Regions:
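Amphipathic, Lys/Arg- and hydrophobic-enriched alpha-helical face
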Residues: 1-16, 33, 98, 150
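The N-cap/first-turn positions of alpha helices
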Residues: 2, 104-105
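Structural recognition of an alpha-helix C-terminal capping motif at a helix-to-coil junction
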Residues: 7, 21-28, 32, 41-53
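Residues within helix-turn-helix
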Residues: 17, 120, 131
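Arg/Lys-rich amphipathic alpha helix in sigma70-family domain 2
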Residues: 35-38, 49-69, 87
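Acidic, proline/glycine-rich intrinsically disordered inter-domain spacer in sigma factors
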Residues: 73-99
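A short pre-motif secondary-structure segment
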Residues: 108-112
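DNA-recognition helix of helix-turn-helix
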Residues: 126-151
């Protein structure tokens, strides 16, 4: 579970240290909480919601601290030896493109395509209507495809 929480935080904030801090803060908060976790219908959705909210808060804080400048650097969590350099660069490029999506689209796309949550789980985590989640993911994928096709050297073609 902690790994999933880290992945969501990392995908949203883009910095491994920030993601670790967020997950640690959430774990401490839950530990100190007076209410037992078994009172929640879906503990995983509850924890993901906490991570999501804390990650979005961290993004806002970082943006304000930098004077509104958007962060585009992506920390790669995988080694990049010479033979995988192109793959790593491509991966970083896709992450930058995902980060350029509107917040609501980026968030649900990450939860669906990178973390693997169902539409229903995403609706519970975000508090969105199920149909809105489905439409949002469709639009996010379409926007991402359009962004990637502008570069054209990453092999994504639109029909």
């Amino acid at each position: 579970m902690k790994r999933k929480l880290f992945v969501v935080a990392f995908r949203l904030v883009g910095q491994a240290q920030d993601a670790e801090d967020i997950v640690q803060d959430i774990m401490i908060r839950v530990w100190e909480q007076q209410q037992p976790l078994d009172t929640y219908n879906n503990i995983e959705a509850y924890l993901m919601t906490l991570v999501r909210n804390r990650s979005l808060d961290r993004l806002k804080y970082n943006k304000l601290r930098r004077g509104g400048e958007a962060q585009t650097d992506v920390v790669s969590s995988e080694p990049t030896p010479d033979r995988t350099l192109e793959r790593a660069e491509s991966h970083q490029h896709v992450q930058r493109m995902v980060r350029s999506l509107p917040d609501s689209q980026r968030e649900i796309l990450i939860l669906r395509d990178f973390v693997g949550y169902s539409y229903q789980d995403i609706a519970e985590i975000t508090g969105m209507d199920l149909n809105r989640v489905k439409v949002g993911i469709h639009r996010a994928r379409k926007a991402l495809k359009r962004l990637l096709s502008k570069d054209n050297h990453y092999g994504v073609h639109t029909a």
